[in-house]
């Protein structure tokens, strides 16, 4: 019964329609892991009129912010996998917001196909934002962190 096609169809339909990001099916001798992007339950939400007006009035502010952010770069994931902020559970993270990083310094680990891939900084700067959480599934080219480049 566990291996019947109806069971699998129901499992897949439930997974696709729900707000799940990870599913795990355990068998006696093996496990199956299924990953997908987390759905956005607010994607069809309409902002109230006042909020829409406020949003459009901030366009000038956003232009100024973009100008200030020229020295901020995104660190992208080179592969899809599980994001780890430290070398092992319970260990201190490699970096935190405000950490100064140097070229070649390990920022995080992406586990893909049972291989731990260290993601290193290719520039000198300070961590501005960490966009992924420990244990999250990340996709190729997803922003992991933002670094403010050091002014030379």
Swiss-Prot record:
Quote one Gene Ontology molecular function term.
acetyl-CoA carboxylase activity
Q: Which SUPFAM superfamilies match?
A: Single hybrid motif
Localization, UniProt? Plastid, Chloroplast
Any one of the GO BP annotations:
fatty acid biosynthetic process
Q: Which residues carry this modification: N6-biotinyllysine?
A: 114
Annotated Biotinyl-binding domain ranges read: 72-148
Q: In which pathway does it act?
A: Lipid metabolism; fatty acid biosynthesis
Known Pfam families for this protein?
A: Biotin_lipoyl
Which keywords does this chain's UniProt record carry? Biotin, Chloroplast, Fatty acid biosynthesis, Fatty acid metabolism, Lipid biosynthesis, Lipid metabolism, Plastid
Tell me which InterPro entries the record gives: AcCoA_biotinCC, Biotin_BS, Biotin_Carboxyl_Carrier/Decarb, Biotin_lipoyl, Single_hybrid_motif
Q: Which GO terms describe its cellular component?
A: acetyl-CoA carboxylase complex; chloroplast
Taking the first listed entry, what is the main subcellular location of this protein, grouped into a coarse class?
plastid
What does it do? This protein is a component of the acetyl coenzyme A carboxylase complex; first, biotin carboxylase catalyzes the carboxylation of the carrier protein and then the transcarboxylase transfers the carboxyl group to form malonyl-CoA.
Q: Which PANTHER family match?
A: OXALOACETATE DECARBOXYLASE ALPHA CHAIN
Q: What is this protein called?
A: Biotin carboxyl carrier protein of acetyl-CoA carboxylase
């Amino acid at each position: 019964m566990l291996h019947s096609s109806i069971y699998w169809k129901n499992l897949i339909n439930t997974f696709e329609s729900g707000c799940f990001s990870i599913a795990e099916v355990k068998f006696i001798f093996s496990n199956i892991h299924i990953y997908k992007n987390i759905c956005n339950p607010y994607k069809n939400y309409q902002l109230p009129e006042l909020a829409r007006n406020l949003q459009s009035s901030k366009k000038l502010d956003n232009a100024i912010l973009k100008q200030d952010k020229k020295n901020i770069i995104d660190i992208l994931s080179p592969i899809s996998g599980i994001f780890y902020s430290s070398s092992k559970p319970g260990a201190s993270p490699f970096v935190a917001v405000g950490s100064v990083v140097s070229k070649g310094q390990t920022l995080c680990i992406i586990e893909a196909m049972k291989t731990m891939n260290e993601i290193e900084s290719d520039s000198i700067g300070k961590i501005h934002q960490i966009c992924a959480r420990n244990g999250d599934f990340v996709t190729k080219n997803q922003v992991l962190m933002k670094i403010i480049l050091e002014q030379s």
